[in-house]
From Swiss-Prot:
Coiled coil: none annotated. It comes from the Bacteria. Belongs to the UPF0260 family. It comes from Shewanella pealeana (strain ATCC 700345 / ANG-SQ1). This is UPF0260 protein Spea_2441.
């Protein structure tokens, strides 16, 4: 039985917790909230540290030094991070759902995740190159595939 099936999120050690992250990069996308409806919108504007080709952070260990607003996902704040996509392993497990078939912990690589269209790799623009972020609202980050 896999550790994510045996343990609660709170019981996981640091290595297990970190391995739950599939590296999709969706959490690194700029998000907008409509002032009137409070609806959340994802954009294809990515954090300046996101590697567009690989779809992951170029400076993960030092990211808070460069981007102080970067959010560290923890067991203590997970429930309040309602902007995490439905495909996020942390969110899925919190909701009592399984890891999807494409998750790197199940497949051994990120290839299935990329083939399932779950990675931001090749789909984003660096936030520093965008003028009007409202023109960059996209729906694909909300996609969730079992």
């Amino acid at each position: 039985m896999a550790f994510w099936d045996e343990k609660t999120l709170a019981q996981m050690n640091t290595e297990e917790w970190e391995s739950l992250c599939d590296g999709c990069g969706k959490c690194c996308l700029n998000k907008l909230i409509d002032d009137e409806t409070e609806e959340l919108y994802y954009t294809n504007a990515a954090c300046q540290l996101l590697d567009n080709k690989a779809g992951h952070c170029k400076s993960y260990e030092q990211r808070f030094n460069f981007v102080p607003s970067c959010t560290k996902v923890t067991v203590d704040n997970l429930e309040s991070l309602t902007w995490l996509p439905d495909s996020c392993a942390y969110r899925r497990l919190l909701q009592g759902r399984e890891l999807p078939s494409w998750h790197p912990l199940r497949t051994g690589s990120k290839e299935a995740m990329i083939l399932a269209g779950m990675s931001v790799a090749g789909k984003v623009t660096c936030e520093t190159k965008i003028r009007d972020i409202e023109d960059h609202i996209v729906l694909w980050p909300m996609k969730d595939v079992e």
